[in-house]
């Protein structure tokens, strides 16, 4: 008789994806982030479900309902902070996961990569709408500023913004629809993530060398299940240190002031994980130009497979490309820092230089480095 996990229609799918899956024998800890992202998503859906039981999406009661969750609901404070800081962990894992794909050339799996880009955009939309729900000052003004960017679209811009708002300003209708979208999107993300995994398992995982590992595969279980559990424990440790010791470290103090349309905060800024894109947006002194740069700063990821000029897949044996890759990482950290600073000298010029550098590295320098490396190797 065949083993049940190999014969049962449902168990068979799980078996082929997580148990008997042939995996490369040499994948490093950089390959842990996929499973960590799955864990972050499940954590956020579960904590979000319990938060939604007590939250009210009405402008008059939203702020107090969040305060009520933190003060009066059993363990409400820990659920709320696990949800908020879980989102930060989600983005750390996302950026690490995408960075790994960039470094080791995983983007040559076109379908998997492009679905990953769609996932990134969907997660960013979800996080943005979630940040608006507590209805503090930064929630309200963040929602106003970011949705207002769409008014830069010629001809239909203003109508589009008012349609999204459900009125002539960010108000009750906006908050209600943002809550509805914030609730449904994680389930859509889960579905897209399954398609992401489906396409990945069509080709099998990449590995640090970037060459085929068909001749040396090992079963996913127990080797990588144990490795993933270690990663999960470290992630939970980091998250709980954040939640239990400094829950507001990554938040904005302005969000503890109830939303007031008549009083603009001195520095409107999004959550830390959007600061790099916000810095690119602010570095262009033209509204439409800034919006286009903002959109392109994320969508540029979809172009990366087309910009791959090297005859080697991974960067592991390409020192020139490695230097440029880590320059890009440093540049993104610089942009993240600038995004949180006020719009004044010298931050303006630093932001503009870092924005130019970002696009220059991806569109020009990295493809050129790939060609130079081919020439140096006489390929």
Curated annotation (Swiss-Prot):
Residues reported to bind a ubiquinone: 201
Binding site for heme b b566: 97, 196
Keywords: Electron transport, Heme, Iron, Membrane, Metal-binding, Mitochondrion, Mitochondrion inner membrane, Respiratory chain, Transmembrane, Transmembrane helix, Transport, Ubiquinone
Localization (cell): Mitochondrion inner membrane
GO molecular function, one term: metal ion binding
Binding site for heme b b562: 83, 182
Annotated signal peptide: none
UniProt GO BP: mitochondrial electron transport, ubiquinol to cytochrome c
GO cellular component annotations of the record: mitochondrial inner membrane; respiratory chain complex III
Regions crossing the membrane: 33-53, 77-98, 113-133, 178-198, 226-246, 288-308, 320-340, 347-367
Organism domain of life: Eukaryota
Annotated membrane topology: Multi-pass membrane protein
Record note on cofactor: Binds 2 heme b groups non-covalently.
Family of the protein in this entry: Belongs to the cytochrome b family.
Subunit structure: The cytochrome bc1 complex contains 11 subunits: 3 respiratory subunits (MT-CYB, CYC1 and UQCRFS1), 2 core proteins (UQCRC1 and UQCRC2) and 6 low-molecular weight proteins (UQCRH/QCR6, UQCRB/QCR7, UQCRQ/QCR8, UQCR10/QCR9, UQCR11/QCR10 and a cleavage product of UQCRFS1). This cytochrome bc1 complex then forms a dimer.
Miscellaneous comment: Heme 1 (or BL or b562) is low-potential and absorbs at about 562 nm, and heme 2 (or BH or b566) is high-potential and absorbs at about 566 nm.
Role: Component of the ubiquinol-cytochrome c reductase complex (complex III or cytochrome b-c1 complex) that is part of the mitochondrial respiratory chain. The b-c1 complex mediates electron transfer from ubiquinol to cytochrome c. Contributes to the generation of a proton gradient across the mitochondrial membrane that is then used for ATP synthesis.
Protein name, as recorded: Cytochrome b
Gene name, Swiss-Prot/TrEMBL: MT-CYB
């Amino acid at each position: 008789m065949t083993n049940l996990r190999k014969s049962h229609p449902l168990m068979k799918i799980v078996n082929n994806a997580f148990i008997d899956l042939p995996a490369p024998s040499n994948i490093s800890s950089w390959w842990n982030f996929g499973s960590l992202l799955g864990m972050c998503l499940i954590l956020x859906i579960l904590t979000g479900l319990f938060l939604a039981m007590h939250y009210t999406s009405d402008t008059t009661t939203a702020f107090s309902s969040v305060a009520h969750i933190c003060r009066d609901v059993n363990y409400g404070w820990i659920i709320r902070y696990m949800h908020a800081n879980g989102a930060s962990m989600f983005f750390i894992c996302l950026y690490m996961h995408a960075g790994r794909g960039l470094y080791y050339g995983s983007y040559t799996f076109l379908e998997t990569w492009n679905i990953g880009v769609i996932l990134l955009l969907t997660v960013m939309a979800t996080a943005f709408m979630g940040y608006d729900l507590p209805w503090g000052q930064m929630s309200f003004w963040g929602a106003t500023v970011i949705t207002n960017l769409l008014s830069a679209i010629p001809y239909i811009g203003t109508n589009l913004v008012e349609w999204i708002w459900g009125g002539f300003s960010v108000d009750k209708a906006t908050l209600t629809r943002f809550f509805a979208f914030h609730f449904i999107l994680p389930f859509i993300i889960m579905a897209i993530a399954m398609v992401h995994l489906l396409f990945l398992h069509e080709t099998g995982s990449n590995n640090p060398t970037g060459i085929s590992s068909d001749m040396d595969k090992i079963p996913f279980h127990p080797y990588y299940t144990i490795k993933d559990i270690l990663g999960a424990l470290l992630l939970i440790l980091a998250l709980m240190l954040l939640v239990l010791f400094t829950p507001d470290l990554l938040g904005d103090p302005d969000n503890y002031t109830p939303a007031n349309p008549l009083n603009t905060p001195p520095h409107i800024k999004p959550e830390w994980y959007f600061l790099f894109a916000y810095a690119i947006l602010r570095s262009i002194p033209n509204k439409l130009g800034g919006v286009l740069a903002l959109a392109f700063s994320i969508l540029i990821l979809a172009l990366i497979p087309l910009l791959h000029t090297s005859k080697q897949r991974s960067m592991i044996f390409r020192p020139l490309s490695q230097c440029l890759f880590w320059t890009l990482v440093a540049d993104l950290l610089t942009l993240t820092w600038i995004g949180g600073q006020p719009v004044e000298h010298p931050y303006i010029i630093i932001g503009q230089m870092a924005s130019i550098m970002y696009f220059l590295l991806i569109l020009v320098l990295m493809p050129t480095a790939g060609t130079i490396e081919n020439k140096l190797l006489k390929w």
